[in-house]
Amino acid sequence: MAIPSNRDQLALSNGSHPEEYKIAALVFYSCIFLIGLLVNVTALWVFSCTTKKRTTVTIYMMNVALLDLVFILSLPFRMFYYAKGEWPFGDYFCHILGALVVFYPSLALWLLALISADRYMAIVQPKYAKELKNTGKAVLACVGVWIMTLTTTVPLLLLDEDPDKASSPATCLKISDIIHLKAVNVLNFTRLIFFFLIPLFIMIGCYVVIIHSLLRGQTSKLKPKVKEKSIRIIVTLLLQVLACFVPFHICFALLMLQGEENSYSPWGAFTTFLMNLSTCLDVVLYYIVSKQFQARVISVMLYRNYLRSVRRKSVRSGSLRSLSNMNSEML
């Protein structure tokens, strides 16, 4: 049985992540950063600048893209930490990034709940279709959930307790940096109720009523395209929530109950990866909702195909020229 060296014991006592995790995190977050930045910048530009007739869904999509961008811009700091193995940006900025890990899924779920309620209105209550064009109410709803989420996240920035304050090198961004604060357990479980269970039940309730209405044929007056689009949005939202957000919140609740002191949790790391992945999976939602976004994606794909064809032609023409030159020299 191998005896860990003093260096290994120091690393474990400092709560450092395993080397395999650091490498995986660097690769994963690099991909998420590049793809997510491209997707969400394009989406925000399309929804805010190129969409002529804005609807409530457009407003919600703008907020989703903005939230994704805010979260994505924090990834380079995490990547730097995993690459260097120490945190040089100070305790307060570490608290900000830790709070952002809690803030992002909380607000994202409420925005997805608003989109679900919007689709409920479009399918089950078509007589209120005019409300779907009332962007003012959608803006107020988004402002409300932003303020509500910020208000419950700010207390995490005001806590000074840190179990790794004396560590060398400085550490950050571990599960324990969030869950060790037993003084705010009441706040954490309240947040789980209001920012996970309630929006989740809203989404499930909307989906159940919509499916019930479709099965009973109560939506016969709707255009087939409207039904198809709404169903695709519903399926996309449901799959994204189940894959990215439900595992993260279940893990968070279990860690809070267990009071685990270890800074590294494989299950916590995996569910955090899934939660981060949602910033890229939103591209499916953008593509379904916006024709302008579809056109932009298609144009990029066509342009890439055009560039490939040009390169192939240039390579072929170059090879033909070289052959002709060789023949002329032989003659």
Swiss-Prot record:
Cytoplasmic-side segments: 48-56, 117-138, 213-236, 290-331
Membrane topology: Multi-pass membrane protein
The protein's name: N-arachidonyl glycine receptor
PROSITE patterns for the chain: G_PROTEIN_RECEP_F1_1, G_PROTEIN_RECEP_F1_2
Summary of the tissues where the protein is detected: Expressed in testis, spleen and brain (at protein level).
Membrane-crossing segments per the record: 27-47, 57-77, 96-116, 139-159, 192-212, 237-257, 269-289
Any one cellular-component term (Gene Ontology): cytoplasmic vesicle membrane
Keywords: Cell membrane, Cytoplasmic vesicle, Disulfide bond, G-protein coupled receptor, Glycoprotein, Membrane, Phosphoprotein, Receptor, Transducer, Transmembrane, Transmembrane helix
Purpose of the protein: G protein-coupled receptor (GPCR) that plays a role in diverse physiological processes particularly within the immune and nervous systems. Becomes active when triggered by various endogenous ligands including endocannabinoid N-arachidonyl glycine (NAGly), delta-9-tetrahydrocannabinol or resolvin D2/RvD2 derived from the omega-3 fatty acid docosahexaenoic acid (DHA). Upon RvD2 binding, facilitates the resolution of inflammation, aiding in tissue repair and homeostasis.
GO process annotations (BP): CD8-positive, alpha-beta intraepithelial T cell differentiation; CD8-positive, gamma-delta intraepithelial T cell differentiation; G protein-coupled receptor signaling pathway; negative regulation of leukocyte chemotaxis; negative regulation of tumor necrosis factor production
Disulfide bonds: 94-172
Family of this protein: Belongs to the G-protein coupled receptor 1 family.
Extracellular side: 1-26, 78-95, 160-191, 258-268
Predominant cellular place of this UniProt entry's protein: membrane
